[in-house]
Amino acid sequence: MKVIIAGGREKDGLIYGYTLQEMWVILRDYMHELRYHGPGRRSRTYVEEVISGCATGIDSLGEQWADCNWIPIKQVPADWKLGKSAGIKRNILMGDYAKSTGQGALVALHDGVSPGTKHMIGYATKIGLKVHVHLVKAKTE
């Protein structure tokens, strides 16, 4: 199945207050759980391709995860010449691409606040993708 991996962006080397290394561990462990255990034996997620929005942060960690697992990556960068709607349009393109083979999924690491990730979750739900949201409590110092 084609799987979008999305979430917050990196700012000053942090995502939701966590280092890239800490977020890598969260993503890696969550993907392992989905692929090999899932909420039930029949619901394990077979990942044939990872879809990335090419943003720094969770998107780039998703690409690294795909590389480490020998999984092809489909990059769908935002066309910022379109202005502020570029991120939303990219999310729609990613969702439609994931759905194009009949099955698709979204894995979102979300703090519950990020508007781009919130939109991706809503759109993926609307078009019938399997949606897996891992809520990440923002870490404050």
Predicted segments, located by residue:
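Acidic/glycine-enriched connector segments
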Residues: 2-3, 7-141
